[in-house]
């Protein structure tokens, strides 16, 4: 999808792949950052690649879309970053986490880190073909939301690790009809 089409659909509220447009996208030329900040007068990306200085890498608005963009050659996978957003009405500067970030530092930090492009080879062509024949608009919706840290714990109160949790949660969800 071309950027103009992606921006148009995003502003229409119909871009169901906005994660491909927004966030941080690393390639051989560096990392392209895009963020939607429609009320901003100025946006810049700050990170460990520029000493967290907001004057070094300003983003440019993409027309009237509310999306801001910059490509930073020095920004590489593993670097931490956030956005410095200046409110166009008040002039207030805020440091914001990337809502489309794909990796984040551990608490108490809240910066995103640049994730390298995926090299994962999907093997779900059969499932996608089966799904294409499914009329999802006529099917019931069944959503199960779980907070992993509180859903189930070891008898002493220690949270399960992700693998341990998966061993328990997946059979439980299947038994509930998910």
Question: Could you tell me what each predicted segment is?
Answer:
Residues 160, 172-178:
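Aromatic-lined carbohydrate-binding/catalytic grooves of carbohydrate-active enzymes
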């Amino acid at each position: 999808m071309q950027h103009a089409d992606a921006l148009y659909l995003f502003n229409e509220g119909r871009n169901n792949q906005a994660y491909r447009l927004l966030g941080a996208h690393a390639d051989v030329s560096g990392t392209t950052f895009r963020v939607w900040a429609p009320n901003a007068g100025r946006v810049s990306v700050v990170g460990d690649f520029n000493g967290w200085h907001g004057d070094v890498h300003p983003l440019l608005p993409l027309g009237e879309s509310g999306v801001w963009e910059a490509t930073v050659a020095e920004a590489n996978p593993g670097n931490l970053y956030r956005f410095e957003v200046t409110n166009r009405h008040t002039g207030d500067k805020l440091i914001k986490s990337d809502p489309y970030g794909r990796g984040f530092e551990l608490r108490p930090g809240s910066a995103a880190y640049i994730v390298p492009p995926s090299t994962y080879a999907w093997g779900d062509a059969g499932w996608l073909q089966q799904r294409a024949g499914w009329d999802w608009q006529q099917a019931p919706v069944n959503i199960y939301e779980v907070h992993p840290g509180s859903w189930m714990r070891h008898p002493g109160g220690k949270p399960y690790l992700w693998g341990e949790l998966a061993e328990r949660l997946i059979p439980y969800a299947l038994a509930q009809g998910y």
